[in-house]
């Protein structure tokens, strides 16, 4: 039985006792980092912000097996932030799309996350309407015309199903519930909100592709919202990339 098949879905539960110590330790480290950054001058903070965003974009794509040119990513971010870094490198459409999504998520964290905004992010990720060679539904919820949305591995004919997402007909309702919670998650630790948002979004898997990258952008948005700053000085995706095997095992 998958998590979304339980009667109490989507009422997610967790062990407060086990999590509280970990969350407290991470929060302390966050505070120390942000405190140190406050003591630096604007140029150094801006460069750290640029480096963090570049790493976040590159590593989030790497998690999915996609390789982006880091120079293109850095140049695209710098241009959008109005930073003069010299040696501007032209970025392709795929890079521009991922950068656009990440900057919108972290830079406009105070704006409401709704379905249209998610559609815009998804369209930015797939500007050609294709994922690799395969044509996909872009800027709208997936359908089940080719069967249920499944995460599989193995050779053709010997596939192993790791996960099956909720039926496509449930997507409007499932996403509406998620967005309502995300707009008012209550008095929870910001790190817990980011983690729950990520898990919830990849569980419903509303798009034909790109769900992982969008889920991580949502988590980054939750963290930026909690810190009340557009500047990022640590990368969630970089850490996940370092622990990718464990990440997929947990999912």
Where are these regions (language model features)?
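FIC/Doc superfamily catalytic core
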Residues: 1-251
């Amino acid at each position: 039985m998958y998590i979304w098949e339980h009667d109490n879905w989507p009422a997610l539960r967790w062990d407060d006792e086990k999590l509280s110590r970990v969350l407290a330790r991470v929060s302390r480290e966050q505070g120390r980092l942000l405190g140190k950054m406050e003591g630096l001058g604007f140029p150094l903070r801006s460069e750290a912000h640029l480096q963090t965003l570049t790493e976040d974009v590159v590593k989030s794509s790497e998690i999915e097996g996609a390789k982006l040119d880091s120079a293109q990513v850095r140049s695209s971010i710098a241009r959008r932030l109005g930073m003069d870094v010299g040696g501007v490198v032209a970025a392709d459409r795929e890079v521009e799309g991922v950068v656009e999504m990440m900057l919108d998520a972290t830079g406009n964290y105070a704006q409401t996350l709704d379905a249209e905004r998610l559609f815009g992010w998804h369209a930015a990720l797939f500007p050609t309407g294709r994922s690799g060679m395969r044509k996909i539904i872009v800027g709208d919820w997936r359908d089940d015309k080719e069967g249920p949305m499944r995460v599989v591995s193995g050779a053709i004919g010997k596939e192993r199903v790791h996960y099956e997402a909720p039926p496509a007909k449930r997507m409007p309702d499932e996403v509406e519930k998620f967005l309502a919670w995300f707009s008012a998650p209550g008095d929870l630790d910001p790190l817990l909100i980011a983690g729950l948002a990520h898990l919830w979004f990849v569980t419903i898997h509303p798009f034909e592709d790109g769900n992982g990258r969008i889920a991580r952008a949502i988590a980054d948005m939750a963290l930026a919202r909690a810190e009340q700053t557009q500047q990022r000085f640590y990368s969630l995706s970089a850490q996940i990339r370092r622990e990718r095997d464990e990440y997929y095992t947990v999912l």
